[in-house]
């Protein structure tokens, strides 16, 4: 993600944007070869579900076996930070402007939605990945799967 992001986004709002982006992005198998987002969202959801219990287990296990408190806490904090890293990455991704090749495809999908009679809000500024996620989610609901053939 070497493209400039929206500078007005605060650190903590990236986590909320990451959650919204993960809920919005369509987890379709045909998008997986092109976008890494499918894998990151699945891994982040897995980490949100399983890392807190793993952190508690490793902390209790190391303390119960007479281990030192410092490494036990460090291991638990690392396990707890993994879901946050995923949400942060997704938040950064959601505000990243689309590269030119994906931008052209974004406008093609929007055009197909408008041809199908769907009312779309006008795009404000340069579209980002959140706008792409919203458009793709709507396209998967309203259009047939052939709109992905030119991807």
Swiss-Prot record:
Membrane-spanning segments: 46-65, 69-91
One GO cellular component term noted in the UniProt record for this chain: plasma membrane
Disulfide-bonded cysteines: none
Cross-referenced Pfam families: DUF412 (PF04217)
Superkingdom per UniProt: Bacteria
InterPro entries xrefs: UPF0208
Membrane topology summary: Multi-pass membrane protein
Signal sequence interval, chain numbering: none
Main location as per UniProt: membrane
Alphabetical UniProt keywords: Cell inner membrane, Cell membrane, Membrane, Transmembrane, Transmembrane helix
Subcellular location: Cell inner membrane
Protein family per UniProt: Belongs to the UPF0208 family.
Name of this protein: UPF0208 membrane protein Ent638_2839
Organism: Enterobacter sp. (strain 638)
